[in-house]
Each structure stands twice: as C-alpha cells, then as structure tokens.
Amino acid sequence: MHGLLYRCAAVALISMAFTSASPAADAAKPHHIAIQVDQNDPQVMNLALGNANNAIEYYRARNEEVDIDITAYGPGLHMLRADTSPVQDRIKRLKDQVFPGKIQFSACNNTKQGMEKAEGHAIPMLPEATVVPAGIVHLSELQEQGWSYVKP
C-alpha cells in the first residue's frame, strides 16, 4: 500500500515538473522591461522612448499589462535633467498616455551628485523623474526581480 502511494506521489511530482503553466496564466502575468540610457545622445534617448512606446502599444493591443522603467545614469542623465533634456516634451507625452505607475523614469543620484559637484549648483530634474540611489544597482535589482533588460 505504501509503495503504491509513494509511486503515485512520485508520478504527480514528475508530472508537475514537466507541465507548463496554462496560456491563460501566462497571459495574466504583467511584462516588465528595464531600459538603460547612459549616453548624452538625443538619438539614443529617442530610441529608448520609442522602444518604450512600441512595447506599450504592443501589449495594449494584446490587452496585456507592461511596466517600463527607463533608467538614466552617467552622461545619459541629461535625458532627465530639466535644464538640458532634449526629449522632455516626449517624456511628458509618454508619461501622460500611460496608466499611472506603468512607466517610471529613474535618475541616478550618484551621477546627479557628481554633476552638481562639477557644475557647482543643484541639478533640476524633470517632474517625471524619480531619483534612485544608483542607476546601475537599480537596473541590476530589476533584472534580479525578473525584468527584461534593454540597451538601445
């Protein structure tokens, strides 16, 4: 009797190991995309924003959720600076078209502090930007949580 019970339990465990989640369960999972911007280049910034917009539109058409985090650090922080961003209007439009909380613009505080020291004044950030302690650590932690990583 015990042998039969153990064999049934073993078969059940093996079956569960080789059974994937149903397509309906996969569709219910939100997608997570982290996009890195580390260059002070309007083309790279626009490419990152285009990637984000394309992902939003794609998943919206499929009635699926997507969370996007665009993290700017190093020279790429200019993307989120209120005084130097060449793409601030596009950032505002993108933020306005997306459900609140579905897109975040993360600004590296290490870079911000370095720029403030070098320039001798406070660096104004766009209102859409959220300052994170370290951009590279932020991206790394998102990846550890299962986010897909994109570098345009």
Language-model region placement:
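N-terminal secretory signal peptides that target proteins for export/translocation
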Residues: 1-4
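Bacterial N-terminal signal peptides
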Residues: 8-17
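Secreted/extracellular ectodomain signature
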Residues: 23-152
